[in-house]
């Protein structure tokens, strides 16, 4: 495990190499402890893990203790419950309750209930119930039920039940068991099991409805 100074230098070199934004780089530059470094990482979670891919779950495990990661709300393995703010990556499973906010990446799994908010990237898996809100990108998979709201981007896959609401963008794929899916953008596909229809949109203007 690197010393704090070695770790700080390594992270700054990686951030500079990947053209980090000024604010994010400054947070790392001004860091006085490993806790500060983790704050810089969580404040720029999407960029660090998905855009730049400058580190991964293994890097976190190799350079921070499980206690240090947990104090920052970061989970890379095992099962955890959160009702505040959490960041999941690696093989972690997080159950989010109340008004919790979880950002998930990699192969992480999130189970969201109540008014929890989840942002899922990579190949993360999310099960959303109640009035949970999910934003899914990359190859994320979401199973939504209750009054959950999902926005699916890239190649995300969504299965919707109950009164769930889904907005499908890019090349996302939605299996709709509710009949409530009303937005398809770019190249999204919605398979409506409730009304026995398939909706396909390619580009900005062409919409095809198949009975």
Pin down the residues of each PLM region:
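Short, glycine-biased loop/turn motifs at secondary-structure junctions and
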Residues: 1-105, 109-113, 119-121, 127-129, ...
């Amino acid at each position: 495990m690197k010393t704090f100074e070695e770790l700080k230098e390594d992270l700054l070199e990686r951030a500079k190499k990947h053209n980090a934004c000024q604010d994010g780089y400054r947070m790392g530059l001004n860091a006085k402890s490993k806790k500060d470094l983790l704050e810089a990482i969580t404040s720029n979670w999407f960029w660090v893990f998905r855009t730049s891919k400058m580190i991964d779950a293994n890097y976190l495990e190799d350079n921070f203790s499980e206690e240090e990661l947990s104090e920052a709300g970061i989970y890379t393995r095992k099962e955890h419950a959160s009702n505040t703010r959490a960041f999941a990556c690696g093989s972690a499973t997080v159950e989010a309750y109340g008004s919790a906010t979880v950002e998930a990446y990699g192969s992480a799994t999130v189970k969201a209930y109540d008014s929890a908010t989840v942002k899922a990237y990579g190949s993360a898996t999310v099960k959303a119930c109640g009035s949970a809100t999910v934003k899914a990108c990359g190859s994320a998979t979401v199973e939504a039920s209750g009054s959950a709201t999902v926005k699916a981007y890239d190649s995300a896959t969504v299965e919707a039940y109950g009164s769930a609401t889904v907005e499908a963008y890019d090349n996302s794929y939605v299996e709709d068991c509710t009949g409530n899916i009303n937005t398809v953008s770019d190249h999204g596909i919605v398979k409506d099991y409730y009304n026995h229809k398939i909706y396909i949109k390619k580009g900005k203007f062409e919409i095809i409805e198949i009975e």
